[in-house]
Amino acid sequence: MWIMFSVFGLPIPISATELLLASAVFCLVFWVVRTWRPRVPQGLKSPPEPWGWPCLGHVLTLGKNPHVVLSQLSQRYGDVLQIRIGCTPVLVLSGLDTIRQALVRQGDDFKGRPDLYSFTLVSDGQSMTFNPDSGPVWAARRRLAQNALKSFSTASDPASLSSCYLEEHVSKEAEYLLGKFQELMSGPGRFDPYRYVVVSVANVICAICFGRRYDHDDQEFLSLINLSNEFGEITASGNPADFIPVLRYLPNTALDLFKDLNRRFYVFVQKIVKEHYKTFEKGHIRDITDSLIEHCQDKRLDENANIQLSDEKIINVVMDLFGAGFDTVTTAISWSLLYLVTSPRVQKKIQEELDTVIGRARWPQLSDRPQLPYLEAFILETFRHSSFVPFTIPHSTTRDTNLNGFYIPKGXCVFVNQWQINHDQKLWEDPSEFRPERFLTTDGTVNKVLSEKVIIFGLGKRQCIGEIIARLEVFLFLAILLHQVEFHVTPGVKVDMTPLYGLTMKHARCEHFQVRIRS
């Protein structure tokens, strides 16, 4: 006996035996998936889980915007729910209070990283950011990286008139951008700002890490930094290849580019580190790389830990710092420029504030930040509304624990939905509306309580180590640019602000930007 099925409009004959066998396999797999759960201690319960397909789980449900889909599911199932990608269970956290409870108050329980395939490709599996290690070695290296980053960014430079290294580097790059934008207006009359912002932001972190900047036409440098989209696509939460092993062996252009990018970036940094070793002088520390070499030669990270820093680990730490200070800042500035040209009223108000506080005789400085609350409110609203980091890098539990009465076993993969927090109607009035004024109090100052509810850099022990620098850098770039020029797009051009999902969500490139010099 044969039964006719239609697939993509084509009739396919299937025997009754084959149908019976397929049904039996389907039922068996479904039973295994549903029953393969850890034993839940008395008094606790398992997180609720929507229905999903056997073997596939919720891959098809997540679609192209998993942050939005999971936010919708949280409204039905609560702040703690479980999905499956393939057959792998994944805990999804939503809600500001729940996420703070997990990452801050129970930070030791949730500070791990899952051992995902894509993570093993970053720095040959030795990345401080993506490596599953969360023990004392990881903690010591993180402290070392934070101290080195602070020493060559927010610390003062005795040889400069700027307040700190970061201010000096950003001011130089902002000056270059202004000159470039004017040059482009004299030529083609329009431009894509991302093409130039990405290099200037990369040059700031290069100056901090390597003590040098690169020309905007350096092809090797451009080929690396312009592949950040591919990096974000692969390392984003929910990449099926991390959970369904067979997908790693199927043709995957993005995955191939990701592997190539990591290999080339490692070689790029390795070459710079070798050059630093050749010219290293103890007592004359030029940048972060020199600082790490000095620690390496001292053969310890701190006085209480017998942990050595190998030459290879220097490369990995520098790569992590580059990532922490590059892609997030570039994306933040890029989104900011889009909001400025689509909200001319907001842009004008920022420039009026800049003129009132700073005047026209000098450029903005980091010390001006407390006196520019509307610009700060604009940056906060850009972070919130775009939520361009929709999820943190996935976490994992380091031991059996419970959250909100739900049992969470050790080693569980955890997605933290930052987008949901930033668009939660319980926290924000009209969350879909772009309105910087929401962050200002009646006396015109920044509402500190509300500003702390915007989550974009993670929380707790895995919080982005470059957060403080990133916030300062975004502020100073925007302050200088808006002080000097007015941004707009070619008349009649409609700006596409549709987010493109990834570790950091980009937008479609716009080649119709224009600037007008402010008098």
Curated annotation (Swiss-Prot):
Annotated glycan sites: 74
Topology of this chain in the membrane: Peripheral membrane protein
Keyword Kinase: no
Binding site for substrate: 231
Pathway participation: Steroid hormone biosynthesis; Lipid metabolism; fatty acid metabolism; Cofactor metabolism; retinol metabolism
GO molecular function: estrogen 16-alpha-hydroxylase activity; estrogen 2-hydroxylase activity; heme binding; Hsp70 protein binding; Hsp90 protein binding; hydroperoxy icosatetraenoate dehydratase activity; iron ion binding; steroid 17-alpha-monooxygenase activity
The UniProt record lists the keyword Iron: yes
Binding site for heme: 464
Major place of residence: endoplasmic reticulum
Catalytic activity: an organic molecule + reduced [NADPH--hemoprotein reductase] + O2 = an alcohol + oxidized [NADPH--hemoprotein reductase] + H2O + H(+); estrone + reduced [NADPH--hemoprotein reductase] + O2 = 2-hydroxyestrone + oxidized [NADPH--hemoprotein reductase] + H2O + H(+); estrone + reduced [NADPH--hemoprotein reductase] + O2 = 4-hydroxyestrone + oxidized [NADPH--hemoprotein reductase] + H2O + H(+); estrone + reduced [NADPH--hemoprotein reductase] + O2 = 6alpha-hydroxyestrone + oxidized [NADPH--hemoprotein reductase] + H2O + H(+)
Top-level taxonomic group: Eukaryota
EC number: 1.14.14.1, 4.2.1.152
Pfam families assigned to the protein according to its UniProt record, in alphabetical order: p450
Disulfide bonds: none
Entry similarity comment: Belongs to the cytochrome P450 family.
Subunit and interaction comment: Interacts with cytosolic chaperones HSP70 and HSP90; this interaction is required for initial targeting to mitochondria. Interacts (via mitochondrial targeting signal) with TOMM40 (via N-terminus); this interaction is required for translocation across the mitochondrial outer membrane.
Stated name of the protein: Cytochrome P450 1A1
Gene label: CYP1A1
